[in-house]
Amino acid sequence: MCVDCKKRVRTRVAPSPTGDPHVGTAYIALFNIAFAHVNDGDFILRIEDTDRNRYTEGSEQMIFDALKWLDLDYSEGPDVGGDYGPYRQSERFDLYGKYAKELVEKGGAYYCFCDHERLENLRERQKAMGLPPGYDGHCRSLSKEEIEEKLKAGVPYVIRLKMPYEGETVIHDRLRGDVVFENSKIDDQVLLKADGYPTYHLANIVDDHLMGITHVIRAEEWIPSTPKHIQLYKAFGWEAPEFIHMPLLRNDDRSKISKRKNPVSLIWYKEEGYLKEGLVNFLGLMGYSYGDGQEIFTLQEFKDNFNIDKVTLGGPVFDLVKLGWVNNQHMKMKDLGELTRLTIPFFVNEGYLTNENVSEKEFETLKKVVGIEREGAKTLQELAKNSKFFFVDEFSLPELREDMDKKERKSVERLLNSLKDEIGLKSIKLFIEKLEKWNGNEFTAEQAKDLLHSLLDDLQEGPGKIFMPIRAVLTGESKGADLYNILYVIGKERALKRIKNIVKKYNIGI
């Protein structure tokens, strides 16, 4: 809760449309949404598209779609409107030049006419002297007359922030306490570029102020920029929002999450078949303790019980194994019919269905498959891949290959040998007989289990010797779903067809 809030709480997320929407955008959006929700406030989406060199066509729509997919809803934004728009920075272009020049008049910024050659020479000298790069304030002391003369002559310029040379700037960060910066170590940041476009620093502060943002919840990588932002607020005479810098998502080696080591595109997670509930739940565990060791929760539960002060700063590891576990929990919790509908496109991609339009009877069969396979699958894609046994009636037995590792070779040898073993052949023959005597085509799961277990009683052998050859002729594999579940789904006729095809194809002597 925000016990000191005097105004209506307003938070925002402000991604740039420069490619696929980033998982970090969803992470920061989630915490902004939860903070606004628990304080009866507003969460808005702003598109920061002033960097035209990196702008990617279609990226903005992908941001909208990704946030909506995850149910990370915003009450104001470019596609929904609002009282503080426009919400694209490119549509607010004239504002930034106006405020930059206003800041010059107030003495908080100045015109800089240094050309590219001078700035390059400055950087080279600083590098040779072992000094950190930064502007040297060359144009800071130009007289009013000199400035007017250059402006009249059309000399290209930028507008720079006039940072104090002395003293300190203190960030009052909600999670970290006071973070102190020496002003002398912060250079005069460009606010307005020569082409008239604002830098992030100017546009960000102007927009946050005009949109009434009360709390800036963003990644900790922005901490070094925050003293410049605080000085901008002071120079304008505006009240700064409260700053809350979230820990960065990390790879296993503690480096900042990047696409070289972890998928970062939200589109990838959707296409891989992660549920929105699973991904949002996982992001809610990043640097945050929900309480009482609870790790599985809904978005609504997260928002209702949110407390920003529970955020920890250790640098949460974005672990795909943990994400898979969380996602599996939500797959098991989800309504079976709804989960089946979500999985149908993945069955189509695997070639098990010709299209997504399935009959009522087909849907009921798919529900059986999904109900079985969701127990062990981490994603919808994995569920579909693991469901091969339920769909493919024509298959071949595996062959020994030179490139097999020891474990795989042993598994295949065991399967093939089971089809030569006397007990294995008896098992197949007796299984066929029992299927042919079965009244009707369908089984319940219990009936299928009882039929298979009756083989153990009749042959007085262990399950390994009996079920391995049956699995081989029923699926062509040495492992997979429980045999009784396969029988339960495919029924008597398909089971007999599979077995007889393999027996004939490989001349198995039963």
Swiss-Prot record:
The lineage of its organism: Bacteria, Fusobacteriati, Fusobacteriota, Fusobacteriia, Fusobacteriales. Monomer. It comes from Fusobacterium nucleatum subsp. nucleatum (strain ATCC 25586 / DSM 15643 / BCRC 10681 / CIP 101130 / JCM 8532 / KCTC 2640 / LMG 13131 / VPI 4355). InterPro entries: aa-tRNA-synth_I_cd-bd (IPR045462), aa-tRNA-synth_I_codon-bd_sub2 (IPR020751), aa-tRNA-synth_I_CS (IPR001412), aa_tRNA-synth_I_cd-bd_sf (IPR008925), Glu-tRNA-ligase_bac/mito (IPR004527), Glu/Gln-tRNA-synth (IPR000924), Glu/Gln-tRNA-synth_Ib_cat-dom (IPR020058), GluQ/Sye (IPR049940). GO terms for molecular function: ATP binding; glutamate-tRNA ligase activity; tRNA binding; zinc ion binding. Its main location: cytoplasm. It holds the Pfam family tRNA-synt_1c. HAMAP family: Glu_tRNA_synth_type1 (MF_00022). Catalyzes the attachment of glutamate to tRNA(Glu) in a two-step reaction: glutamate is first activated by ATP to form Glu-AMP and then transferred to the acceptor end of tRNA(Glu). GO terms for biological process: glutamyl-tRNA aminoacylation. Keywords: Aminoacyl-tRNA synthetase, ATP-binding, Cytoplasm, Ligase, Nucleotide-binding, Protein biosynthesis. Belongs to the class-I aminoacyl-tRNA synthetase family. Glutamate--tRNA ligase type 1 subfamily. It comes from the Bacteria. The keyword Ribosomal protein does not apply. A motif ('HIGH' region) lies at residues 15-25. The keyword Nucleotide-binding applies. This is Glutamate--tRNA ligase. It is found in: Cytoplasm. A motif ('KMSKS' region) lies at residues 256-260. It catalyses: tRNA(Glu) + L-glutamate + ATP = L-glutamyl-tRNA(Glu) + AMP + diphosphate. NCBIfam families: gltX_bact. The gene is gltX.
